[in-house]
């Protein structure tokens, strides 16, 4: 696998403490605020007119929860991310035509949210391990493009 045993331990140790539903909504919300062009995929979600509207939007929260639960499932298959995300890759790439760069942006936003939630515990070693994971997931999701 692309993660060492130690890195897997760091990732799983922190992930066990993550409130997946809450963090998912926050990460997707921040993506839409920080990178406004990503909003075009979410036009059916209602009010995205301001940061407050986005962060409070129940559809954004619900989809964020879904996204992070999928990410969570992916962590259980960390040595076969391409397999774990094959169906989602097909949906997002073939059917929704999402630019794979957006998966990378969301991964980086997720890292920011985790740093914000966990403070000192999200030390450089933990961050390095998570950056590898989000890059791996983004690559797996972009797999259909290659």
UniProtKB/Swiss-Prot annotation:
Transport among the record's keywords?
yes
What tissue specificity is annotated for this entry? Red blood cells.
- Residues recorded as bearing S-nitrosocysteine in the entry: 93
- List keywords of the entry alphabetically: Acetylation, Heme, Iron, Metal-binding, Oxygen transport, Phosphoprotein, S-nitrosylation, Transport
Q: Name one GO cellular component term.
A: haptoglobin-hemoglobin complex
Q: What does this protein do?
A: Involved in oxygen transport from the lung to the various peripheral tissues.
Keyword Metal-binding in the entry? The reply is: yes
Q: Which family does it belong to?
A: Belongs to the globin family.
Question: What Pfam families does the record point to?
Answer: Globin
GO annotation (BP), single: hydrogen peroxide catabolic process
Domain annotation Globin: ranges: 2-146
Cite the source lineage: Eukaryota, Metazoa, Chordata, Craniata, Vertebrata
The protein depicted here goes by the name Hemoglobin subunit beta
Single GO molecular function: organic acid binding
- The entry marks the following residues as binding heme b, namely 63, 92
Record-listed Phosphoserine modification sites: 44
Q: Which residues carry this modification: N6-acetyllysine?
A: 59, 82, 144
What does the subunit comment say?
Heterotetramer of two alpha chains and two beta chains.
């Amino acid at each position: 696998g692309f993660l060492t045993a130690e890195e897997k331990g760091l990732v799983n140790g922190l992930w066990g403490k993550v409130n997946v539903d809450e963090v998912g909504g926050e990460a997707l919300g921040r993506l839409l605020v920080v990178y406004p062009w990503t909003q075009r995929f979410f036009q059916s979600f209602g009010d995205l007119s301001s940061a407050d509207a986005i962060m409070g939007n129940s559809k954004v929260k619900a989809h964020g929860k879904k996204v992070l639960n999928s990410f969570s499932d992916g962590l259980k298959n960390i040595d076969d991310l391409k397999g774990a995300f094959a169906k989602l890759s097909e949906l997002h790439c073939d059917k929704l035509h999402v630019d794979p760069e957006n998966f990378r942006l969301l991964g980086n936003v997720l890292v920011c949210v985790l740093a914000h939630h966990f403070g000192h515990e999200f030390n450089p070693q933990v961050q390095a391990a998570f950056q590898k994971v989000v890059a791996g997931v983004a690559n797996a999701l972009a797999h259909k493009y290659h």
